[in-house]
């Protein structure tokens, strides 16, 4: 995350951004990196809408590699280490205010068993309070796999009674899971933000909307049926957003907003 990219984003008319907490992308634990981001946001009139909590250590942007960390790791030492890492990300709010921390509850291969469930509860019970004290709401994201799917998240919230926990609805992950409409029905009451990207229903490709098989007309109509006006946050692979002018990203935003407006008018 550098000044030239922030400038390009601003010129494209995008005003609110989500930043991914991966050390090569944004070193959230370093005060100098935080100061530079704060300065860039102010200079280009941008707002930090959300941070995506770290999921791996030493992860290069756009790569699926590195040492994974999980707040639902049944092994106590690793879980506490993961929680501490998330707390470092939340501490960014002491310098740069943001509304939401997007959090994965586990990894894609993790089973929804009792040990993982208890570990996630112990972590989030602490993190929700830590976040709230800094003006941040934790939004758990639906992810591919058994433990992070919409049905599992619904069960988790129902049984843990974590009343301040909210959801980030990831439309691409829902498309891979039981479908957009079915996942949204399970999550709609607690959704506060979104991740929008496309795929072909088989793997997590993070394509631009329209490049996969999601029915965006139906999806936007379903999203806009939510009583809250949910923010539309594009979450793309580096390849998809690789055009330095961000023309394709801005075009995708325009199409989404147009589709959303039509959905509201037709409601």
Q: Across the structure, where does each feature detected by a protein language model lie?
A:
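Catalytic-core regions built around general acid/base machinery
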Residues: 33-44, 123-130, 183, 218-223
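Histidine-acidic metal/acid-base catalytic patches
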Residues: 2-13, 97, 147-267
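Active-site loop/turn elements of alpha/beta-hydrolase fold enzymes
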Residues: 21-22, 53, 105-106, 143, ...
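Active-site acidic/histidine proton-transfer and metal-coordination neighborhood
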Residues: 3, 43, 60-166, 226
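N-terminal pre-domain/capping segments
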Residues: 1-88, 94, 250-267
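Short, small-residue-enriched loops and turns at beta-alpha junctions
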Residues: 25-27, 56-58, 108-111, 142-148, ...
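Conserved beta-strand positions in the central sheet of alpha/beta enzyme cores
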Residues: 18, 50, 102, 139, ...
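Flexible, glycine- and charge-enriched loops at secondary-structure boundaries
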Residues: 27-30, 34, 72-79, 110-117, ...
């Amino acid at each position: 995350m550098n000044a030239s990219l922030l400038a390009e984003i601003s010129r494209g008319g995008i005003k609110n951004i989500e930043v991914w907490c991966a050390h090569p992308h944004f070193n959230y634990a370093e005060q100098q990196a935080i100061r530079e981001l704060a300065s860039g946001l102010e200079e280009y009139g941008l707002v930090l809408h959300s941070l995506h909590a770290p999921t791996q250590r030493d992860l290069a942007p756009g790569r699926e590699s590195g040492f994974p960390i999980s707040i639902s790791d049944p092994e106590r030492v690793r879980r506490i280490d993961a929680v501490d890492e998330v707390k470092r990300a939340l501490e960014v709010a002491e310098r740069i205010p943001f509304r939401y921390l997007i959090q994965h509850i586990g990894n894609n291969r993790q089973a929804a068993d009792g040990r993982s469930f208890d570990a996630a509860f112990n972590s989030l019970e602490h993190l929700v309070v830590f976040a709230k004290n800094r003006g941040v709401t934790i939004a758990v994201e639906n992810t591919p796999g058994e433990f992070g799917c919409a049905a599992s998240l619904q069960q988790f919230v129902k049984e843990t009674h974590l009343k301040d926990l909210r959801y980030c609805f990831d439309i691409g992950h829902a498309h891979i899971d039981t479908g957009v409409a079915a996942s949204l029905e399970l999550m709609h009451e607690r959704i506060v933000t979104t991740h929008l990207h496309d795929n072909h229903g088989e793997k997590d490709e993070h394509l631009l909307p329209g490049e996969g098989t999601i029915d965006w007309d139906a999806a936007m109509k379903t999203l806009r049926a939510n009583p809250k006006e949910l923010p539309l946050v594009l979450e793309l692979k580096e390849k998809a957003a690789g055009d330095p002018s961000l023309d394709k990203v801005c075009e995708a935003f325009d199409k989404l907003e147009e589709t959303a407006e039509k959905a509201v008018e037709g409601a």
